[in-house]
Amino acid sequence: MEDETVALVIDNGSGMCKAGFAGDDAPRAVFPSIVGRPRHQGVMVGMGQKDSYVGDEAQSKRGILTLRYPIEHGIVTNWDDMEKIWHHTFYNELRVAPEEHPVLLTEAPINPKSNREKMTQIFFETFNAPAFYVSIQAVLSLYASGRVTGIVLDSGDGVTHVVPIYSGFSLPHAIMRLDMAGRDLTDYLMKILSERGYSFTNSAEREIVRDIKEKLCYVALDFEQELQTASQSSSLEKSYELPDGRVITIGNERFRAPEALFHPSMLGLEAAGIHETTFNSIMKCDVDVRKDLYGNIVMSGGTTMYPGIAERMHKEISALAPTSIKVKITAPLERKYSVWIGGSILASLGTFQQMWISKQEYDEAGPTIVHRKCY
């Protein structure tokens, strides 16, 4: 069924790796970006113990493993572990031979040059890819929404970026990075639930809290008003059944956790909220493009999935923007995977086929070719 040379699209996030085939409308494989190694050598003797586990298998065996995330705040920090994740992607998840398919990889907006070179080198030298390309995550999200100009708020598990894009090119001087994302909100929810008397501490319990966050949290349009409503009635309370059968009740925590996106000071961070960061990024752009950016604010990534976030963002940005400006927030339903979807669209365009870095070009020019061909 697969075309012999169909391109592979891999979106490496801090929390999840999304991988699949160009032209598909969703990734085939979505698994945690983690590598686990046994804490004690020889504990599992005779159980066919491996020296490392990746993704879901590492997650399920986490009791006996030390888990590491090779991508921190969107940037690869551990190349040995990263290589294991890519190996797992090809051989276990997609079941393809990397030397038979062009590979489109995604990268964080302010990825160091040396990192792009290292990625390029690994794909050509370790995996023998026939062709390779690396694309900025936020730009792909914008493509997926059918635009080439706009400003993308991309918030995942490990990092949040605001990236203004004009005619398909990001404007690097105005890109903003906020080291606050899904993982921090999960931690904060653990903290405020413990104040209610529910104790969640270890990594297994953290997964439960992440699930509570994804199922029950939302963004309030008016935080103070919502707090008042929550204190006066039980209308906002929801119950959640824990794996052991106990049922817990969660009230104002439902909207207190995501509120930190707008007020990072709640987490003890000295940073502007996502609304101010977006506004600041727009203000760093040329005055002539601002109107187009205000009218095309696109949300992307799992941490933008909270109900109510687009409405709140609209309210906050409108309060900051000049009165005559029309503010439009787009929050596509598939925004959890819009980076991957944008990659799938790009890699299957006929016009894109001359953009790939070929193995021959790499052999002639070396890893620095990535800066000339991918920008």
From Swiss-Prot:
It holds the Pfam family Actin. It is an enzyme of class 3 (hydrolase). Keywords: ATP-binding, Cytoplasm, Cytoskeleton, Hydrolase, Nucleotide-binding. It is found in: Cytoplasm, Cytoskeleton. Its main location: cytoplasm. Gene3D superfamilies: 3.30.420.40, Actin, Chain A, domain 4. The keyword ATP-binding applies. Belongs to the actin family. This is Actin. The gene is ACT1.
